[in-house]
């Protein structure tokens, strides 16, 4: 049960049933038992399919077309007017960071660029439900961060996002709730906090404290029968460092100009 306006992560090892679940929701296959409802309707309802955007794990495009042309093609399939198609295409190519390459044929695109145009394709019909299968596959840290920002912005606009990814850090960053499948069965589901929080372990972030004061804090905790598991300096992430260097170089380039 996925709630309207949330980002829901679907996780599981290879062969767990994630792709089968997506195919059921898209009406590409049908259940042998029970039923699947999407936006309150059965999955064979054509009107419902018009309200869904889908990014498959591997996108197949006509590589001789450029970004504008491929998005226009998909827009025509949804019977979007020419004026509205142009407005959406202009917005989407900029949103996914492909404005500089919109007139290049897709055969000249890198894997990451093709992933970006795939995301734009999934949004061309302004869907209510967006299903994304490995959306950050092939993207560098900058593209990954921008893609996650796009997904969060969809939620802010009231869209519902179903996200499948093997990159658990991405899921943890942006998903409201997750479900874990294994061997075709739901193993567990809930919010990130519900699934990961531990009542027995408390984390404290402290700054501007001397080594002597830290030692006193440790002693106090032990006196209260607590256990200090580790004390170490705070560290960032490689993604954070990468983005920091990239932002600094961008600022330096602007200064040089």
Indicate residue ranges for each PLM-predicted region.
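ABC transporter nucleotide-binding domains
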Residues: 2-163, 168-182, 188
């Amino acid at each position: 049960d996925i709630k309207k306006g949330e980002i829901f992560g679907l996780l599981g090892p290879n062969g767990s049933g994630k792709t089968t679940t997506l195919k059921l929701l898209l009406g590409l296959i049908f259940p042998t038992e029970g039923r699947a409802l999407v936006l309150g309707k059965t999955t064979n309802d054509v009107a419902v399919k018009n309200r869904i955007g889908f990014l498959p794990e591997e996108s197949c495009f006509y590589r001789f077309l450029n970004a504008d042309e491929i998005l226009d093609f998909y827009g025509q399939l949804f019977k979007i007017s020419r004026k509205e198609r142009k407005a959406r295409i202009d917005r989407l190519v900029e949103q996914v960071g492909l404005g500089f390459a919109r007139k290049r044929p897709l055969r000249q695109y890198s894997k990451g660029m093709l992933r970006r145009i795939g995301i734009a394709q999934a949004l061309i019909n302004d869907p209510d439900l967006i299903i994304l299968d490995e959306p950050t596959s092939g993207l560098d840290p900058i593209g990954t961060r921008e893609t996650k920002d796009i997904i969060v912005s969809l939620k802010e606009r009231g869209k519902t996002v179903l996200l499948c990814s093997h990159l658990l850090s991405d899921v943890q960053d942006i998903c409201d709730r997750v479900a874990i499948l294994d061997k075709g069965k739901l193993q567990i589901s809930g919010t990130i906090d519900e699934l990961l929080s531990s009542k027995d372990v408390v984390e404290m972030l402290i700054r501007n404290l001397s080594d002597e004061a830290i030692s006193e804090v440790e002693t106090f905790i032990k006196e209260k029968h607590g256990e200090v598991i580790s004390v170490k300096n705070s560290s960032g992430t490689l993604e954070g460092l990468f983005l920091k260097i990239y932002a600094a170089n961008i600022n330096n380039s602007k200064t040089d100009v």
